[in-house]
Regions:
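A donor-sugar binding/catalytic signature common to diverse glycosyltransferases
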Residues: 188-234
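Conserved donor-binding/catalytic core segment of Leloir-type glycosyltransferases
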Residues: 108-130
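Short, well-ordered alpha-helix to beta-strand connector turns
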Residues: 37-39, 153, 194-195, 212
Length: 351
């Protein structure tokens, strides 16, 4: 929805009004829905269906389009980097958010950590969603990374509406917001909108820091190539994919040849003979350290890393099995330099 508004603002030659129509406005977060309603004009129920019917028939309406089947927001035009967010918190909401931060004795920098597991879909959908298992991680592997960020002076909020296990750490700068009773729907949005940066494994909540233009790093991210991620100005350290017969780490060329580089289904990886390995605690520490340095402006890439970044961007921008045409989905994301240094064979076999 946010991208639809930005596309409109970018292309509009005369004053127009966008009207969103829906049978219902079920939403996973009511605080976010309030922000949307505050910034856009919406109709719902029978009135919405009447408006939709009229928009198809009467020429006074400039255009009609459906966003019902737009499952993934892909920012081809780079509008998220060109324009400021249209969502605004009320004074009351800002006061509540600031009071919460003050109660946690947070005066400056904090990071949101969101680690996907099976609990949310199992609880909300009423069944185990095996299709998405490949995206899950174990929160215990992130403890060392969170503690590393805390040592750098950041407070770390573990995010999530429904989580499988607690984040266990004695460090007072690490707050298991998702499991300790602090969580509210407003704070879900406020924290994502005001964090110094976000570390996430890829989920619906990522839209919050994205919409509010907060820096984001995706760790344990799959698929390796996803236009909804690679068109963002983000940093990625993907899960490690191996041949399930030989145990050898698969290169990007291997993934493309097996038609698995872009697949978003657990069964697809099994059918392709691919084993998925989550990042180790050590790798996660490297990843978040690099992200903190990038945000702080202290990160320095080696000449070899710069060369690998350029090569990878060229491949992702032009490969005919990844792009309908060259640069159709502009590559604005970078892969973590520590990933490229650890796995230089990832780029072997491709020019």
């Amino acid at each position: 929805m946010r991208l639809r508004n930005l596309e409109h603002n970018e292309n509009a030659k005369k004053k127009e009004i966008i009207v969103y129509c829906s049978e219902n406005w079920n939403c996973s977060n009511n605080a976010l829905r309030k922000l949307f309603f505050r910034s856009s004009f919406h109709l719902r129920g029978p009135l919405a269906w009447l408006a939709l019917s009229l928009s198809r028939k009467i020429k006074i309406f400039h255009s009609f389009s459906s966003i019902a089947n737009r499952n993934l927001p892909i920012d081809r035009a780079g509008l998220l980097t060109k324009q400021l967010t249209m969502l605004k918190f009320s004074n009351e909401e800002v006061c509540k958010g600031q009071s919460f931060l003050a109660s946690c004795e947070i005066k400056s920098r904090f990071v949101c950590l969101h680690v996907r597991d099976s609990a949310y879909l199992t609880t909300t959908m009423g069944q185990q969603r095996k299709k998405h298992d490949y995206r899950d991680s174990e929160i215990k592997t992130y403890v060392a990374a969170a503690e590393s960020l805390a040592e750098m002076g950041y407070t770390v909020f573990r995010m999530g509406a429904i989580v499988k296990e607690p984040l266990v750490s004695d460090n007072p700068r690490i707050i298991d917001y998702a499991a300790n009773g602090m969580r509210t729907e407003l704070l879900d949005i406020f924290l994502g909108a005001h964090c110094t940066f976000t570390i996430s494994t890829g989920s619906g909540w990522d839209s919050v820091p994205t919409v509010f233009r907060r820096p984001i790093m995706f760790v344990n991210q799959l698929p390796v190539y996803a236009p909804s991620v690679t068109t963002l100005q983000s940093v990625t350290f993907p899960k490690i994919l191996l041949d399930n017969q030989t145990g050898s780490i698969l290169s990007l060329k291997n993934l493309i040849d097996r038609e698995i580089a872009h697949r978003a289904n657990s069964q697809a990886y099994k059918d392709a003979g691919v084993e998925i390995r989550d990042l180790s605690s050590e790798e996660l520490v490297e990843a978040v350290t690099e992200m903190a340095q990038r945000v702080e402006g202290t990160f320095v890439e080696t000449p070899e890393q710069k060369e690998m970044q350029a090569k990878l961007k060229h491949i992702l921008s032009t490969h005919q099995k990844l792009q309908p045409s060259p640069n159709y989905y502009p590559i604005r994301a970078q892969f973590a330099s520590c990933f490229l240094s650890r796995y230089p064979n990832f780029l072997h076999g491709l020019d």
